[in-house]
Amino acid sequence: MARVKRGVQARRRHKKILSLAKGYYNARRKVFRVAKQAVIKAQQYAYIGRKQKKRNFRSLWIVRINAAARINGLSYSRFMNGLLKCGITLDRKVLADIAVHDPAGFTALAEKAKSILAA
């Protein structure tokens, strides 16, 4: 049986890693061993970041809703409780968008929440 030489596969693997390491500084871009570690770590950070992004946006929406609710004389928790009792099922993303781009519409929602909480 003929001897198998793995030069082609190795070169392909090295090129793939080094192309993923484009934009890195010094040995992290040029040396395969270092570049491989840098790419693996970067992919870990990217994976973690995709999870953190969801949490960060949710907290941003809550901050925006809370600020708009307090302008209308309600706390965030009482505002959300009022909406729940009214049967309004808008999610936080939409509520935050309404708070930023349509303050009058948000005020109407806040008034509905206030009226149901007062009753």
From Swiss-Prot:
GO CC field: ribonucleoprotein complex; ribosome
PROSITE patterns per the UniProt record, alphabetical: RIBOSOMAL_L20 (PS00937)
Alphabetized UniProt keyword annotations: Ribonucleoprotein, Ribosomal protein, RNA-binding, rRNA-binding
Family: Belongs to the bacterial ribosomal protein bL20 family.
Protein name listed in UniProt: Large ribosomal subunit protein bL20
Pfam families reported for this sequence: Ribosomal_L20
Role according to the record: Binds directly to 23S ribosomal RNA and is necessary for the in vitro assembly process of the 50S ribosomal subunit. It is not involved in the protein synthesizing functions of that subunit.
Family matches, as HAMAP family: Ribosomal_bL20 (MF_00382)
Organism: Xylella fastidiosa (strain 9a5c)
GO BP of this protein: ribosomal large subunit assembly; translation
A molecular-function term among this protein's GO annotations: structural constituent of ribosome
CDD domains per the UniProt record, alphabetical: Ribosomal_L20 (cd07026)
